[in-house]
Amino acid sequence: MYINETYAKKWAPVLDHPELPAISDPYKRAVTALVLENQERALQEEARSMQNLWEASPANAMGSTSPNGLAGAAGAPVAGFDPVLIGLVRRALPNLMAYDICGVQPMTGPTGLIFAMRSQYASNTAMTGEALYNEANTHYAGAAGANPLATLNANIANVTLANTGTGMTTAVAEDKTLEYMGFQIDRVAVTAKSRGLQAAYTLELAQDLKAIHGLDAETELTNILSTEILAEINREVVRTIYATANIGIVGLSTAQFNLSSSADTSGRWQVEKYKSLLFAVERAANKIAKDTRRGKGNMLIVSTDVASALSMTGLLDYNSALTNNTNLMVDDTGNTFAGLLFGRIKVFVDPYSVAGTDYAVVGYKGATPYDAGLFYCPYVPLQMVRAVDPTTYQPKVGFKTRYGLVANPFATAAGLGALANDTNYYYRRFQVLNINQ
């Protein structure tokens, strides 16, 4: 994402609003500023469309400058349209769980592209295999061994001088045709998808709600619709990670960790078995490092009972969730940050996990927004539409949002960024059985 400092300065009054939690992360500020800019552009286009429909506004039109609307200050970022939308974007966007469990790449248009470059072993006519990923093929640029190490998966038991490539002798080098290498560019298309909700209310309801409770019906419905849309996007991100994560701790055959099985754990006390669960998490994190060559797993999504089991081991530092609460961006919809495991793995509790079905999902997310297995790509977060029923003359309100969701091109073997079950190398999931025994 290209970070435009002009947007950050333009939206500074909104980003630094004193009544809202501060956005300390520079990238979150940049993403929020860009999405606010997209929101403003969408509202301006909507206003121009309305002007094309009517030569003059009717006398009873309700807009941002009407007595029933809210007006932005002249010259301010929200001038000329309802700031309720801007406020919702400012509150909602930084609290998305996606910032912590996947990458966030805002879109500036309805479609976008993600490019990835792969180094390749090649012939003079075609690519033959990816390079600079797993262990280097020692015979490729030198003299071939009898059984190249590349076919042995670096199994130390099978490594001998006979199957390790060496440099070429002068006689061989003077006459040998050198091997080819090259690169290919993978292109992944991201297309914005939409979500929308609507609500209707009567003028009588609005009048009574205002008179008795002092509440504005449109504002309350706006909050309900926007909160529901945000909650649905959050759950889509979480469930997509669950579905696309590779299965198992090491390999696809170990999809379960059984605390009552001697094959998985052995301990006299329950807390000793829980420490075996920690080792299972470490093995999954190590497997992610081998598959991605980016880093060990540093993020963990667990069910409630698994989080409690981890805390019983004494290695889940939940104090960080209290002392640094202002920086953790705990999701308002219920997904909570539990603390740090081993001082480096962020642990998130999924409050919607079904009782009796315990699991853990280990994932990796790098320091930059480009280093993740899944990308959430917001385009227009909230677009509000007001209407009046032509028969009853009762008001209606609707919301639509547009965003994309795509896998990292390097996250799957195909490299196409497709969201497919059990294929994403950046995440691994396994079920935890008999946690109460």
Language-model-detected regions and their locations in the chain:
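Short, intrinsically disordered N-terminal pre-domain segments
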Residues: 1-22, 244-245, 257, 316-330, ...
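Extended assembly-interface regions of large multimeric machines
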Residues: 1-139
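Acidic/polar, low-complexity extended loops/arms that serve as protein-protein interfaces
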Residues: 70-78, 89-98, 107-236
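Sequence/fold signature of self-assembling virion shell proteins
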Residues: 82-83, 92, 98-100, 171-232, ...
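Short linear, low-complexity motifs centered on an aromatic residue
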Residues: 123-142, 243-247, 410-426
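Short, glycine/acidic-rich hinge or "gate" loops at secondary-structure transitions
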Residues: 217-218, 233-256
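Acidic/histidine-rich catalytic neighborhood
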Residues: 248-273
